[in-house]
Amino acid sequence: MDSDQGKLFVGGISWETDEDKLREHFTNYGEVSQAIVMRDKLTGRPRGFGFVIFSDPSVLDRVLQEKHSIDTREVDVKRAMSREEQQVSGRTGNLNTSRSSGGDAYNKTKKIFVGGLPPTLTDEEFRQYFEVYGPVTDVAIMYDQATNRPRGFGFVSFDSEDAVDSVLHKTFHDLSGKQVEVKRALPKDANPGGGGRSMGGGGSGGYQGYGGNESSYDGRMDSNRFLQHQSVGNGLPSYGSSGYGAGYGNGSNGAGYGAYGGYTGSAGGYGAGATAGYGATNIPGAGYGSSTGVAPRNSWDTPASSGYGNPGYGSGAAHSGYGVPGAAPPTQSPSGYSNQGYGYGGYSGSDSGYGNQAAYGVVGGRPSGGGSNNPGSGGYMGGGYGDGSWRSDPSQGYGGGYNDGQGRQGQ
């Protein structure tokens, strides 16, 4: 039997997690024939995800039913599929239908997105505010990797879905003297836009994978698996136009949290950079979006060049939003998301998958630049996975895989 049938994708792993730790954890479920942590081909730094191959493929069923924590970090596990299998699934219409068929299922989450955070807010203050709604299991404030400046947004995880419902009784909260916006964070497979139409590769559609164009999954907590819930069904470009491989923790390419125009301008990111800023009233073009045009002032009294619901919100203004994360001050969470955007626009760069142009998986679709026959244009990039032959199982919730090929931007 082909050993690749027992292949598991593991995302959101700590930078400190190596192959030995990966193998040690999953050996509890069965014999591990191979464990791989993907690394940046230029810097050698871990990319925050990897793969495990079990000798007995039947082990995967049990692994996928449980939650996993390695080096105190909750990781995301999905069945890996070959490109051929992915394409067959796409042709037969089985792309995540059980997970994106509508109804209330996609609203069920224990995580929220919080935008417009004060720049001086600490993790502890962040946690204390939301603990009044229920026990908090994790918090993360996003930072710019290059400057260590807070990006103005973060995530809070509760131990119950009811706590999220309580928080969302109002959209705006007063936190440390500043009004912040709260939204439900959803797994990218939960597509409120309806069905599998939004999951194709390329264009501006699909919940397509974590990733950016260069460094990769350097986010420090599992919130990199989530994106904001929104009611617009147009495109939802999602976690990465460039695949899982790069979106976490590379430079600031001006993209970020959203293809919706995002919370920031076109070149800086959430509160960082000359043309962006999540409410920097003295910055022209700041606010929610990067697309041009006059927009109403946002909740932070910021002249937004695009604005929530204005041009760019849910449209092709994919390269904007919350930019990059990165190292954080010692007292705060070092987590962060990709240089190209987390969520609506996706964690991802504009031109590659695992740092290339095909990447790990446009569901049944082709990558935007280069195909699977181009060297380094697909797959897991490095370590024998550069042939673009594998993707994540869409039925496991990755929507279009880890790459959108150019749509989204998407994490």
From Swiss-Prot:
It comes from the Eukaryota. Residues 192-212, 362-387, 397-411 have a biased composition (Gly residues). CDD domains: RRM1_hnRNPA_hnRNPD_like, RRM2_Hrp1p. GO terms for biological process: mRNA processing; mRNA transport; regulation of response to salt stress; regulation of response to water deprivation; RNA splicing; vegetative to reproductive phase transition of meristem. Pfam families: RRM_1 (PF00076). Residues 341-390 are annotated as: Nuclear targeting sequence (M9). Keywords: Cytoplasm, mRNA processing, mRNA splicing, mRNA transport, Nucleus, Repeat, Ribonucleoprotein, RNA-binding, Spliceosome, Transport. InterPro entries: hnRNP, Nucleotide-bd_a/b_plait_sf, RBD_domain_sf, RRM_dom. Residues 6-82, 110-187 form the RRM domain. Residues 87-101 have a biased composition (Polar residues). One of its GO terms (cellular component) is nucleus. Residues 81-103, 183-221, 358-411 are annotated as: Disordered. It is found in: Nucleus; Cytoplasm. One of its GO terms (molecular function) is mRNA binding. Component of the spliceosome. Interacts with TRN1. Involved with pre-mRNA processing. Forms complexes (ribonucleosomes) with at least 20 other different hnRNP and heterogeneous nuclear RNA in the nucleus. This is Heterogeneous nuclear ribonucleoprotein 1. It comes from Arabidopsis thaliana (Mouse-ear cress). The gene is RNP1.
